[in-house]
Amino acid sequence: MRVVVSIGGSVLAPDLDPDRVAAYAEAIERLAADGCEVGVVVGGGGVAREYIETARELGANEVELDQLGIGTTRLNARLLIAALAGGANLSPATGYDEAAAALRRGEVSVMGGVTPGQTTDAVAAAFAESVDADLLVYATSANGVYDADPNVDDDATQFGSMSPAELVDIVLPMSRNAGASAPVDLLAAKLIDRAGIRSIVLDGTNPEVVVDAVLRGDHTGTDVIPTGSEEPIYWTGSSDA
């Protein structure tokens, strides 16, 4: 099974804790050992935001801020590559062809941001589409997709499952509200809808949750299920992991 895992920077390295990065590397290694082809996209998290806020105060324009954010995602990606100890590409892929080539070599393919104006949410969706991934997992700091921002609405209700089109409908109004926090960004949702990518949005604070979700479909997040989508092979009983 080919899977792309998007790990938020605030999930992987909220405080540059080496034990946390190592735990994520171990989880990814378990997926690879079980026969998965694994691509990983790493976000910038709080570190990126701090750099961006500082650079904005210094007068940097939006493209410069985006480039700074991309650089931070690649630093986080390098941390993960170091923890994977030779099982991944030597340096973060800077484009989709390079990332796909690493998969073809049998490596864990790790990348950060790619293009100014595009979040790592969207990068992960585009990467998954480009390699025809069976599954896309967003390991975030939120436990799935809600009908409203749970950070500001105590009555927000979580979806157990939804279609990609429904994901777009949920994310669209959040993308227009500067105070709202969408589970994935709008471009990512549209790419998932366009490509019909089976996806999961979950709380990735514990890396073991990602392993359970990929190998067994066992999680408490939200399944994004395209029409006619088949369950990944591991969920149909071909693996006892």
Swiss-Prot record:
Primary gene name: pyrH
Gene3D superfamilies per UniProt: Acetylglutamate kinase-like
The protein's annotated pathway: Pyrimidine metabolism; CTP biosynthesis via de novo pathway; UDP from UMP (UMPK route): step 1/1
SUPFAM superfamilies, per database record: Carbamate kinase-like
Membership in a protein family: Belongs to the UMP kinase family.
EC number: 2.7.4.22
Reaction equations catalysed: UMP + ATP = UDP + ADP
Source domain of life: Archaea
GO molecular function: ATP binding; UMP kinase activity
Protein name from the UniProt record: Uridylate kinase
